[in-house]
UniProtKB/Swiss-Prot annotation:
Family, as annotated: Belongs to the methyltransferase superfamily. Type-7 methyltransferase family.
Catalytic activity as recorded in UniProt: 7-methylxanthine + S-adenosyl-L-methionine = theobromine + S-adenosyl-L-homocysteine + H(+)
GO biological process, one term: methylation
Binding site for S-adenosyl-L-homocysteine: 18, 62, 67, 99-100, 132-133
Pfam families assigned to the protein according to its UniProt record, in alphabetical order: Methyltransf_7
Protein name: Probable 7-methylxanthine methyltransferase 4
UniProt binding sites for Mg(2+): 170, 256, 258-259
Source lineage: Eukaryota, Viridiplantae, Streptophyta, Embryophyta, Tracheophyta
Function: Involved in the biosynthesis of theobromine.
Top EC category: transferase
Entry EC no(s): 2.1.1.159
Keywords per UniProt: Magnesium, Metal-binding, Methyltransferase, Transferase
Domain of life: Eukaryota
Pathway: Alkaloid biosynthesis
Length: 365
């Protein structure tokens, strides 16, 4: 399944929109803010013969407000702080917001008025850059900072988990799970390695000398790709989908043949791909854990399901139909509420963050 036209966050600002339900991603951005600040400020102590007059910043898979606006604010404030420390003139800042064509860029750009009001004395500009980050997006040596939060773990296509005869090997599931065949994990891991390598390979010529890239991925802590905290969401939705199959609302074949184009890598997997691809040196790498169990905003099943729905619904509705989405997520909420009572829900959100520096003296074909 080609996903370039169907992977995007829920549009607009309605009840089930990404705008209203992106709280977890904002927590991830806040938790990783020091790493982003350090990467931004390192741009001002490289081999540049003169202070930068323009800083070009790309946000890959930006989605829509409030996530990219928060990242944008961190970049601006980091540059203001560093220029104040060095006593140098503030450069102009050009933000390039990248996502697939299906992204709701209109809602994103409407939110820029908040940033404009907040940073009246900073000269910044914004533009959209639609396209896939699995290919080239920008001119050579043009970007000083590339940033991406919770995007590059999405795959360019769904992993093919079938037998030699073409029969599905992950029946009743939409992601890896404890009951999945070993082929499911191998196919998904191989797809991630291929796609992540392409992200690195195509960014390398686009980054200026001494350019930095900050990537934040939804990942996992252990070597086990089926650990509970990363598979819980997809197991929950698979159980709800199985219920819809039993009710005759969707075809069983549609469920058995479907796998989400998503992969939660470990820190070791991310570092291994970076080293193998060879375009970047790793300046910083870490696994960041957010507790989402207990008494917090996600302890309400309804709010948690909205958080899941805002990013998973577009790809699910393409496979199973928009007409069953309300029933699907209502059932998922019902299952989640029961899991809460039994203490079976996921309690952690895992992020992998890496800060990369472009290697010098490279040639590209």
């Amino acid at each position: 399944m080609e996903v370039k036209d169907i992977v995007f966050m829920n549009k607009g600002d309605g009840e089930n929109s990404y705008v209203k339900s992106a709280g977890l991603t904002l927590k991830v951005i806040a938790k990783t803010q020091p790493m982003v600040q350090k990467a931004v400020q390192s741009l001002f102590k490289g081999t540049h013969s003169a202070p930068l007059q323009v800083v070009n910043v790309a946000d890959l898979g930006c989605a829509l407000a409030p996530q990219p606006l928060e990242s944008m604010s961190i970049v601006i404030e980091s540059i203001v702080e560093k220029c104040g420390e060095l006593g140098c003139e503030m450069p102009e800042i050009q933000f390039h917001f990248n996502d697939l064509a299906g992204n709701d860029f209109n809602t994103l750009f409407k939110g820029l008025s908040v940033v404009q009001e907040k940073y009246k004395n900073v000269s910044w500009f914004a533009m959209g850059a639609p396209g896939s980050f699995h290919g080239r997006l920008f001119p050579r040596n043009s970007m000083h900072l590339v940033h991406s939060c919770y995007s590059v773990h999405w795959l360019s296509k769904a992993p093919k988990i079938t037998s030699e005869e073409g029969l599905p090997l992950n029946k009743g599931k939409i992601y890896m799970s404890k009951t999945s065949x070993x082929x499911x994990x191998x196919x998904x891991x191989x797809x991630f390695e291929e796609d992540f390598s392409s992200v690195l390979r195509f960014r390398s010529p686009e980054l200026a000398p001494d350019g930095r890239m900050v990537l934040i991925l939804n990942g996992r802590q252990s070597a086990d790709p089926t650990e509970k905290d990363i598979c819980y969401l997809w197991d929950l939705l698979a159980e709800a989908l199985s219920y819809l199959v039993s009710e005759g609302l969707i075809d069983e074949e549609k469920l058995d043949s479907f796998n989400v184009p998503y992969y939660n890598p470990s820190q070791e997997e991310v570092e291994r791909v970076i080293d193998k691809e060879g375009s970047f040196t790793t300046e910083f790498s870490d696994t960041v854990v957010l507790e989402i169990g207990g008494k917090n905003a996600w302890s309400d099943p309804g709010l948690r399901i909205k958080g899941y729905r805002c990013f998973s619904e577009p790809v699910l509705s393409h496979q199973f139909g928009e007409e069953v989405m309300d029933k699907l997520f209502d059932k998922a909420e019902e299952i989640l509420a029961e899991d809460y009572k039994q203490g079976k829900e996921a309690t952690k959100n895992i992020s992998i963050v890496v800060v990369l520096k472009k290697k010098t003296n490279q040639t590209w074909t």
